Amino acid sequence: MGNIHIQTKSKEYDVHVGKEVLSNLTTIVQNMQPAVSNVMIISDEAVASLHLQTVIDALQVEQHVFSFVVPSGEKEKSFENFYAAHTSALENKLDRNSLILALGGGMIGDLAGFVAASFMRGIRFVQVPTTLLAHDSAVGGKVAINHPLGKNMIGAFHQPEAVVYHTPFLQSLPEKEWRSGYAEVIKHALIGDVELYHWLKEEVQTLADLHDEKLIHILTKAIPVKANVVSQDETEKGVRAHLNFGHTLGHALEKELGYGNITHGDGVAVGMLFAIFLSEQVYKVDLAYEDMKQWFLKYGYPKMPRDLNVERLVQLMKQDKKANAGAIHMVLMQEYGVVNVVSISDETVHIALEAFQKDMV
């Protein structure tokens, strides 16, 4: 078991990581001040069928505990479910001393966190992640829902009271979700922990290696990368944008292909490869792009789809939150462990995307 301390300007809290940390949940809730009045667990159908009762049983508290369950899938991070969650909260008499538990992956963490951020102008919540991908989204306080015109466009910054990362919950994940989450692990290694990057190349030959002590090691190394960035820039005014490495194209792919047709991690993996491909041209450096491409393909990450319209992707990349005055801003890599936000012309991105698309045959 390992505890990772997160410190931001607005709040300090711990991430509890391990095989038995669910037992910490009762103490976490009981120690909150002012005392918690009641507890709302927000989850999705897939996770609830596997883990909801386990969490309710582990949560040995006197307060009223109830659940609100939405269908599974990124498209459910919608205004309709956000509104319905508020209705459920009001019907069950949540108040300003209530607590929301986000039980699920990144979609649920974002949705439940935004409900917590907005209900009565903000109440407390705890993240209980059930995916590897959520090692990224559960930490840092960014919560949001999607808009038909863009991912995570309606949201807030709202830090949790704690994150309880009970690793046995991850064992029920399908392979595509392991791969999706592992992409964010790779991202954290590439931008902030070169030693972890080399460890991954040596120790994680297949996704089947992501278990037990190796999994806990990965989580306790990757999460501090994000924690360090968030401590410097809680509200994404500067270096926190570095955590968007691979996301400019990744989000565009998710939007173009349709949420659920490509996982977030698969999109980010393609986006990271493109960022490295473009970085070599912009910085005139050798980042071993070809080796990186083969490494990604070994894990089963997809290639850049050949049938996608490049100009359409360019326009979607201009809708990215880092864009400024209509110009694309991407996180590019100067060297492993050193990244910067760079303004790139539409023409440069278009030419590079066409070349990248052809290279990914």
UniProtKB/Swiss-Prot annotation:
Record: residues binding NAD(+): 72-77, 130-131, 142, 151
Single GO cellular component term: cytoplasm
Residues reported in the UniProt entry to bind Zn(2+): 184, 247, 264
Molecular function as annotated in GO: 3-dehydroquinate synthase activity; metal ion binding; nucleotide binding
Subcellular localization: Cytoplasm
Xref: InterPro entries: Dehydroquinate_synthase, DHQ_synth_AroB, DHQ_synth_fam, DHQS/DOIS_N, DHQS_C
A Pfam family this chain is assigned to: DHQ_synthase
Membrane-crossing residue ranges in chain numbering: none
UniProt keyword list: Amino-acid biosynthesis, Aromatic amino acid biosynthesis, Cobalt, Cytoplasm, Lyase, Metal-binding, NAD, Nucleotide-binding, Zinc
Primary site of residence: cytoplasm
Cofactor note: Binds 1 divalent metal cation per subunit. Can use either Co(2+) or Zn(2+).
Gene Ontology biological-process annotations: amino acid biosynthetic process; aromatic amino acid family biosynthetic process; chorismate biosynthetic process
The reaction(s) this protein catalyses: 7-phospho-2-dehydro-3-deoxy-D-arabino-heptonate = 3-dehydroquinate + phosphate
Cofactors, names only: Co(2+); Zn(2+); NAD(+)
HAMAP family: DHQ_synthase
Family label: Belongs to the sugar phosphate cyclases superfamily. Dehydroquinate synthase family.
Stated name of the protein: 3-dehydroquinate synthase
Gene behind this protein: aroB
